[in-house]
């Protein structure tokens, strides 16, 4: 409300195929999870904090699963192939067969490594970077899908007792909506009316304002069409990028036609 946080949402987490949660416990603002996949057991931590970085060199709060950091050691660069090769198994000590991997440099630029067909061979991902990156600090982790679905864009009214109800005596025809975001990278807006789905990509910093190699983050407003009956429309925000995503406001416009009036 007025771009101030007034309520948290309920969340659902999916840790992917073949992952079993053995135990979970919260300490302070962190949850520790004991998990198991086909290659062994391991522990993960989830932080319930905003604007939090795990290392001082982290360029921004990276949204990555199983996030680690290390410097690329000498001897990783091949002059013949003009690339730098890094094997992740020595750093993780745990095998991971599935998932797209992101490697982010301290300046904010990131490299994407899609999951190969059939998964990572032997659960030991090996990453090849163009050029010589020896001595460069990387932040590495697995991509995950962030998905937020807005509640229905309906007219709310408050009675004398302070209760809130939905105005449902007429038809609300939506025209457009918008989201306000702060210090945010790329994301996708999905609009579904039950019969068709429309995708609108937001690229982060506007074209012409960004610099190559710098984080593409922006604070702005994005407007998009939402046509049809408000009851049938669903609006969802989706992102698989490691960049921050902070939605601080939302609004909509439409035409309301009241079918009946009280006497």
Q: Where are these predicted regions, by residue range?
A:
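Beta-sheet repeat architectures centered on beta-propellers
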Residues: 1-263
């Amino acid at each position: 409300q007025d771009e101030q946080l007034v309520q948290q949402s309920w969340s659902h987490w999916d840790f992917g195929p073949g992952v079993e949660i053995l135990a979970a416990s919260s300490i302070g603002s962190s949850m520790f999870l004991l998990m198991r996949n086909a290659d062994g057991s391991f522990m993960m931590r989830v932080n319930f904090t905003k604007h939090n970085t795990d290392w001082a060199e982290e360029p921004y709060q990276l949204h990555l699963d199983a996030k680690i950091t290390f410097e690329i050691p000498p001897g990783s660069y091949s002059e013949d192939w003009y690339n730098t090769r890094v094997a992740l198994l020595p750093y993780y000590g745990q095998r991971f067969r599935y998932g797209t991997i992101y490697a982010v440099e301290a300046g904010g630029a990131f490299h994407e490594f899609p999951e190969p067909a059939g998964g990572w061979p032997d659960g030991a991902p090996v990453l090849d970077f163009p050029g010589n990156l020896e001595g460069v600090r990387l932040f590495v982790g697995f991509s995950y899908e962030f998905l937020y679905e807005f509640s229905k864009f309906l007219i709310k009214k408050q009675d004398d007792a302070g209760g809130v109800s939905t105005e449902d005596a007429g038809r609300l025809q939506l025209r457009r909506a918008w989201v306000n975001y702060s210090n945010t990278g790329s994301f996708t807006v999905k609009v579904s009316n039950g019969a068709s789905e429309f995708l609108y990509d937001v690229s982060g910093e506007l074209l012409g304002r960004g610099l190559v190699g710098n984080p593409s983050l922006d604070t702005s407003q994005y407007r998009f069409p939402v046509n049809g009956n408000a009851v049938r429309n669903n609006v969802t925000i989706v992102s698989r990028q490691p960049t921050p995503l902070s939605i601080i406001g939302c609004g909509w416009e439409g035409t309301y036609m009241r079918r009946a009036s009280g006497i």
